[in-house]
Amino acid sequence: MEISWGRALWRNFLGQSPDWYKLALIIFLIVNPLIFLISPFVAGWLLVAEFIFTLAMALKCYPLLPGGLLAIEAVFIGMTSAEHVREEVAANLEVLLLLMFMVAGIYFMKQLLLFIFTRLLLSIRSKMLLSLSFCVAAAFLSAFLDALTVVAVVISVAVGFYGIYHRVASSRTEDTDLQDDSHIDKHYKVVLEQFRGFLRSLMMHAGVGTALGGVMTMVGEPQNLIIAKAAGWHFGDFFLRMSPVTVPVLICGLLTCLLVEKLRWFGYGETLPEKVREVLQQFDDQSRLQRTRQDKIRLIVQAIIGVWLVTALALHLAEVGLIGLSVIILATSLTGVTDEHAIGKAFTESLPFTALLTVFFSVVAVIIDQQLFSPIIQFVLQASEHAQLSLFYIFNGLLSSISDNVFVGTIYINEAKAAMKSGAITLKQYELLAVAINTGTNLPSVATPNGQAAFLFLLTSALAPLIRLSYGRMVWMALPYTLVLTLVGLLCVEFTLAPVTEWFMQMGWIATL
């Protein structure tokens, strides 16, 4: 018997999301206008809390849908205006271009990145050195490329290698269900479990590496570009401004990588089983023999384009998004990708997040119109200039660990800029606060997958169930990094940021605008 119209509508609404989640969103949509009539300020904060809730529940439903419904209602009932949303989007056009074009551009360089990580995995036998190499490679690449793309490449390598060994272990040559272990005997299962532990640790090291590198440059994370634009910094300025905090954090993060591997803490320390290495090496040898001259020239071209990308960013030859567009044009032209559908695949990863970011800007418009963060900012600004830096770092960190860091970074830099324009803080203090906001937004966010988009991408990937990487296990494995990155970052903001920045100014390396 066919279901009723009402039941059909209920099932279609937010698709496979749990019933309690659907009901919660409907309650939000009903309650918000009623609260807005009584107290716009309370209604605004309620909207922010609801939006953070949708981000925290990203595994239940992609936040664009529930967050978008809340944002549309907010505009309809007058919490903000469509014109203000348009102004926020226009002011952050560079970030949208970064997501649309840079992420798509790096998609066409995946062969080179796959080649790099494959060579690392098979060339380095020491697990400590291999873990450090993955962390450093991910950090370096994420300083210039999109972190999601770097993680996507490492996932591709891991899934490919897992599939190769799984087929051997299950004695099947054809593609099989990688989650089906029923055809694997006990001995192979023990080796497979060890291999899973090995891949889990490598993925976490690479994920943290993207955070370590991503915080250092204006293109490392989307919120970095928002903060750089608000402060009027170019690529080199941004790197130097952040370095009093980010360089010590990078060093301590890499030492943490070595320490957890050496002591086998928090689920780290598993080595690559020799039987697995033999299987993977045989496969790689066959692949290299089959690589044609055309394939080799593609890798060379992609490496040259990579040099162009780094040079163009460092010299600020154009806006970041336009440099990304040039990468798309060069990579597709010189590697023979001419089909519209093949080019279109490059945009599938970035456009949903670009749409979600536009919804973020709608909520930011509400925050500005309803002056939601004014009490918090006033509280922070009542403290001494020195204490303000730590307070901004801590408030950013707390919110970023449970919510999206683009959203958090945008809110706080807007509030700090408004305080500077009103004369509440000096330009020099504003620039120091911008560093505290950027580092506070990026570093503590490794605590949960909700804070780091790269972690969330890993958790929702096809690899996570294969290597038994759950939400809880990811939080546990990230814990040593969370503690070290957060505390070292706070100490640097407290003690090294102001004096080192002052020294940079005396040396003439940076200047207050």
Curated annotation (Swiss-Prot):
Q: Which GO terms describe its molecular function?
A: sodium:proton antiporter activity
Show the catalytic activity.
2 Na(+)(in) + 3 H(+)(out) = 2 Na(+)(out) + 3 H(+)(in)
Q: Which GO terms describe its cellular component?
A: plasma membrane
* Record keywords: Antiport, Cell inner membrane, Cell membrane, Ion transport, Membrane, Sodium, Sodium transport, Transmembrane, Transmembrane helix, Transport
The yes or no answer to whether the keyword Lipid biosynthesis is present is: no
Superkingdom assignment: Bacteria
Question: Where would you find the membrane-spanning parts of this chain?
Answer: 23-43, 52-72, 97-117, 120-140, 144-164, 202-222, 238-258, 303-323, 348-368, 391-411, 447-467, 475-495
Location, primary (coarse class) = membrane
Q: How does it sit in the membrane?
A: Multi-pass membrane protein
Q: Where in the cell is it found?
A: Cell inner membrane
InterPro entries in the cross-refs: Na+/H+_antiporter_NhaB (IPR004671)
What family does the entry list? Answer: Belongs to the NhaB Na(+)/H(+) (TC 2.A.34) antiporter family.
Q: Identify the PANTHER family for this entry.
A: NA(+)_H(+) ANTIPORTER NHAB (PTHR43302:SF1), TRANSPORTER ARSB-RELATED (PTHR43302)
Protein name (record): Na(+)/H(+) antiporter NhaB
